[in-house]
Structures are given as C-alpha cells and as structure tokens.
C-alpha cells in the first residue's frame, strides 16, 4: 500500500514540475474515498484563485464519493474560475489515474468552459 502512495506522489511531483516550467495556472484535483477537492492555483503556486469540493454545504447533502458528485464539483470549479477571470488551466491530477471521478470532474470543467 505504501509503495502505491509513494508512486502516486512521485508522478504528481513530476507533473507539477512540468506545469511550473510552463508557467500556467493549474487545476489541482485531490480525491479521498469519501470526498473530492479541486483548486485553481496561480502560476507561481502561492495563491488559490478558486476552489470547490464535496465538503461544501450544498454538495454535502447528496452522495459525495461518486462520479456524479465529481461532475458537480467540476461544474462549480469552472464557474468560479470564470468569475475569477481564468479561462485556461493546466490539469494537475495529482498522480491519480485519469479515470472515474477524476475524469468526470475534468470533463465537467471542460463542458462548462475551462480550457485544458
């Protein structure tokens, strides 16, 4: 189990270094078995420009650990990023496979106007 986590963190580190070289704003996703979190982080990496998660009051009432919840988080993060004036982001999946909830969040964000 520990090796699996270490490998994921290694993949995440490599991705973040590449995104930092590009100097783009990034959409960072983190998932746990119960919740999913999304943040739009500045190019310098020192400021969170927008965030959304299943921990928020309006999403907490429904199921929080499934693809439907991830889709709702994707829609909300795209809307909040647009309000902050952000149209284009680099997708940081934090070493997680692009599948299931991570994919659902990314697809919903794309459909609601964010460019990756």
From Swiss-Prot:
Alphabetized UniProt keyword annotations: Ribonucleoprotein, Ribosomal protein, RNA-binding, rRNA-binding
Biological-process GO terms, alphabetical: translation
GO MF entry, a single one: 5S rRNA binding
GO cellular component: cytosolic large ribosomal subunit
Taxonomic superkingdom: Bacteria
Leader sequence segment: none
SUPFAM superfamilies listed in its UniProt record: Translational machinery components
Gene3D superfamilies linked: 3.30.420.100
Record-linked Pfam families: Ribosomal_L18p
Assembly description: Part of the 50S ribosomal subunit; part of the 5S rRNA/L5/L18/L25 subcomplex. Contacts the 5S and 23S rRNAs.
Known role: This is one of the proteins that bind and probably mediate the attachment of the 5S RNA into the large ribosomal subunit, where it forms part of the central protuberance.
Recorded family membership: Belongs to the universal ribosomal protein uL18 family.
Official protein name in the record: Large ribosomal subunit protein uL18
Gene behind the chain: rplR
């Amino acid at each position: 189990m520990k090796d699996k986590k270490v490998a994921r963190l290694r993949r995440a580190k490599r991705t973040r270094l590449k995104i930092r070289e590009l100097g783009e704003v990034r959409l960072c996703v983190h998932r746990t078995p119960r919740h999913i979190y999304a943040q739009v982080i500045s190019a310098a990496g020192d400021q969170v420009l927008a965030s959304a998660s299943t921990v928020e009051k309006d999403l907490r009432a429904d199921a929080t650990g499934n693809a439907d919840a991830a889709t709702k988080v994707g829609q909300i993060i795209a809307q909040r990023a647009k309000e902050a004036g952000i149209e284009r982001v680099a997708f940081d999946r934090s070493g997680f496979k692009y599948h299931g909830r991570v994919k659902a969040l990314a697809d919903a964000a794309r459909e609601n106007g964010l460019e990756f």
